[in-house]
Amino acid sequence: SAQNPDLAHSVTTEGTTAILNHAVRNGIERFVYFSTAHVYGAPLVGNFTETSPTNPVHPYATTHLEAELAVDAAHDLGEILGIRVRLSNGFGRPMTYEAADWRTLTSDLFRQAVLEKRMEMRTDGLQERNFITKTDIARAVRHLIELPQTQVGNGLFNLGGSQSQSLLAMATTIQERAQSKYSTEIPLHRPEPTTADIQHLNFDIHKLLNTGF
């Protein structure tokens, strides 16, 4: 999306709006849109709830926020029950090797561990991120589809894991799992830290949890 912001706008903003309008015209009752936590800004450092101000700095985040606004407007007008989900970092086994996005941290490190029996991080790993399994994402979709209208409110929910952790902690977990599975040492390399400070992230999901998720 950074290389082609016009395409990002066409696919994410205009594409979502077209599907939304089609749903409204055909009497669909509920529309669940998956946005991104990056609408709050980048890098994500600090505390974020659904009432936190948005500050998208990348076409990926900007176009998702634009699509959110279309869903929000239809929801406010009573045209459809519009639910917007701001997702943190999903991870898990891809359906196929070709369908996976191997650029993400977890997928890249898993791939390295399996194919190269070594892992190389691009950063020192002290930044915190919020991770959620694809299984829990699927569970959230079902929950939001079945959620009583009285609990939907304005339709905006953060979706992530119960707590954030550093990229290094996630990488170490992957390393330990891979070493156990393959019964061999898998070294983990990373650039030397330039500071001892961890950039903390609190991605608050209590609003969704309070609906029974």
What does each model-found stretch correspond to?
Residues 15, 19-23, 67-71, 140, ...:
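Hydrophobic positions on the long internal alpha-helix
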Residues 40-41, 58-59, 86-104:
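Flexible, glycine-rich beta-alpha linker
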Residues 42, 55-88, 113-115:
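Active-site Tyr-X1-5-Lys
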